[in-house]
């Protein structure tokens, strides 16, 4: 049986940063990247339906803020939206996040897929980290790093098995929702 450890989110996170303040354009071209915003993060998943485009000639995006497969995204502002968590399972085009989202990437100590599920399991706690006046709440990143505890098996192969199992269950749920939506039509 694998030994299980618990560490603060900050200890198992290599990058925790907010997104960029984009310069939006309407038409895609070779100088644009997709920008995810809070509307894109719902029900623990990312939808590109409300994504916009940033003109990189006007506002460059640091390489570390370009999104990768298995990145975890948290909405950082707003009553009712701050604290929403989702994980990217595929990044097929260059994309980043705006300044109202937080990007998390794990250290090498933890499997990225497992990490996403571990962070999502703390959604209710993360949501409570929002501070500020009504309508202007924001997730406190220092508290996010120190107060959220991630529990994981030390054996990375065990982490990978758990992450894959949870992903397969989520895939079945997505497939069932799609079937149900087709039945309604």
Whereabouts are the PLM-identified features?
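Sequence-specific dsDNA recognition surfaces
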Residues: 6-26, 39-71
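Non-catalytic DNA-recognition/assembly elements of restriction-modification systems
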Residues: 1-20, 151-185
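Short, positively charged
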Residues: 111-143
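Short helix/loop capping segments that flank catalytic or ligand/cofactor-binding pockets
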Residues: 44-46, 84, 112-113, 127
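Structural signal for hydrophobic
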Residues: 9, 36, 147-148
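A short beta-sheet element
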Residues: 37, 54, 62-122
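A short glycine-rich beta-alpha junction/loop motif
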Residues: 94-102, 133-163, 167
């Amino acid at each position: 049986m694998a030994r299980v450890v618990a560490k603060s989110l900050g200890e198992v996170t290599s990058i925790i940063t907010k997104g960029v303040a984009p310069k939006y354009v309407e038409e895609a071209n070779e100088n644009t990247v997709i920008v995810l915003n809070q509307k894109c993060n719902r029900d623990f998943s990312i939808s590109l339906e409300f994504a916009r485009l940033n003109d990189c000639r006007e506002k460059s995006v640091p390489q570390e803020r370009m999104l990768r497969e298995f990145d975890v995204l948290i909405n950082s502002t707003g009553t009712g939206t701050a604290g929403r968590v989702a994980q990217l399972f595929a990044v097929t085009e260059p994309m980043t996040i705006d300044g109202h989202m937080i990007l998390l990437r794990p250290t090498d100590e933890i499997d990225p897929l497992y990490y996403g599920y571990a962070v999502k399991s703390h959604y209710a706690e993360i949501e409570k980290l929002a501070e500020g006046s009504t309508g202007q709440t924001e997730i406190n990143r220092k508290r996010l790093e120190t107060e959220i505890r991630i529990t994981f098996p030390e054996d990375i192969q065990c982490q990978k098995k758990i992450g894959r199992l949870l992903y397969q269950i989520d895939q079945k749920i997505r497939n069932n929702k799609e079937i149900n939506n087709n039945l309604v039509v």
